[in-house]
Amino acid sequence: FIPAYPDWIWHIPAGQITLNQKLYGELLDQAVSIPGATTDRLCQAARDAGVYVSIGVNERNDNASGGSLFNTNVLIDREGNLLGRHQKLVPTVSERMIWAYGDPSTLDVYDTEIGKIGGLICHENYMPLARYSLYGRGIELYTAPTYDQGGTWQSTIRHIGKEGRVYVAGCCMVLRKDDVLSRYPQMEPYYQETGEWINTGNSVIADPEGHIIAGPLSMEEGILYADVNPEHISNTRWNLDVAGHYARPDAFQLKVRTAPTPVITIDRGDSGFVSTDVEDNTFIQKDTVDETESV
């Protein structure tokens, strides 16, 4: 079981401390360690199906306190290898009661046999510099998982497709009011909106010219399919390539930090130090002198 989007953060006031703590504790218990048993199963599923998988999870910060969460997207290749993860850089409004700020070192593009894959999460896609950091690394297949579902969001997906000359998949979950209240009836006072749907989904796929080629898929669970033509990506960059001939690095520069940020730094003088490896959460003895410890 992988918990999805915590919709209740938009309904329950922050002052309802007892209820918020209970729900957060449950979400933390269900959260995913990366790598861990859950990602191992996802990797096995990708290998069995022979597909690339891009999936959102609530990630626990196991390399530090273990008590905080990130809104994270995981990418797995068809051989079952965990290529990487991206943590949402800035939680949106009420999301900050749940998720920590993501580490920018997780902002990356992965070169695969089917193209260069990467993406941003929800309202990160309104961050021009974040988008450009992907364009500048040659992204071709752009994932945009979201909880947004309105007409403006579909226009955003189309804009990204044309701006970056990429294929972009805007995937949004569908959620009925009964999906929440059937399990958490105590939340009914906070869910007084009329209608069956909390989120209608409206997932779409757009091409490098900003045309919607699949979807929108609304008020139902399902799968969108679209054919990807690599030549269409390169051909459309003939007249617009924002990280190529349409760039002006002499006028504008973007600096992206790729080194992970340590939670704490401990100075141990000349005795060497022990640090936490961010990727596998193991402790490594460093034989160094006059160094600092990064955890």
Residue spans for each PLM region:
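Short, compositionally biased leader-like segments
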Residues: 25-49, 153-183, 259
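Active-site beta-strand/loop signature of hydrolases that rely on acidic residues for catalysis
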Residues: 1-16, 22-26, 46, 53-54, ...
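Active-site catalytic loop in hydrolytic enzyme cores
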Residues: 15, 31-51, 59-141, 145-159, ...
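Charged, glycine/proline-rich intrinsically disordered loops and linkers
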Residues: 7-29, 178-193
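A short linear hydrophobic-aromatic micro-motif
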Residues: 52-56, 213-214
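C-terminal beta-strand edge segments of enzyme domains
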Residues: 173-295
